[in-house]
Amino acid sequence: VYKRTFLNPAQLFVGSFFLIILIGAGLLMLPRATYSGISFIDALFTSTSAVCVTGLIVVDTATYFTPFGQIIILFLIQVGGLGILTFASYFSYFFRGGSTYENQLVLSDLGNSQKLGEVYSTLKNVILITFSIEFIAAVLIYLSLDEAHLNSNSEQIFFSIFHAISAFCNAGFSTLTNSIYESGFRFNYSLQLIIIATFVFGGLGFPIVSNVISYFSYQFNKINPFQDKEFSSRPWVLNINSRVTLVTTSSITVIAFILFYFVEYNNTLSEHQGLG
């Protein structure tokens, strides 16, 4: 993927984002992407917001963009969430069947890998875990939907995929004008809980999620009666970084929930009942 270059890994990383943002803006300006056209500034802003997963919009994603345009936004969110170099490097490696030593040096710097031999293994795991969680989230979102609020099964599927990816990448984009406060969705608490969980998994980051998955996989294999008796694996524990992150995330979430619940109980939450 990478030949000898004057750019260091940090410059290459930033440059790749500028490139995908410009490409995304160009794609969003295609006639098929919008119903009534879009200015370059609005397209550039939307593309930047999607790639940098900020969730800020200057036009309504639901009514301004066609399904094709929304797919472009979804692609930009996914690439921005994973990092364009993760995509480009891994799939180039996959199709070419190998990598140069210099490529691995660049990627190990970008991915903070301690061993060169683990660079592509790490990239593969990042993509695998990301797509797996997004797939599970999309299925759960689909099962939580009320058919009466979406016109067809294909719309339900697209809605599920879009919001699963948007949630995992912490992007904040929605195909609903008022996001999930939209009438017909604001009281769908199962949908909200699924999106919350997906937000958290995406926000924790790959190293934490990978460590948690490895830990629970090891614990499950220890008690699995169908596991091969010769099963042997390095004992997995939650490392200090994972523990600190999990405790901090849980604590802040619980404290914020309690404060928001009592402060807004008779205001924005007044239309809900109980903990809903």
Kindly label every feature range from the protein language model.
Residues V1-G276:
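Membrane-proximal intracellular helices of multi-pass ion channels
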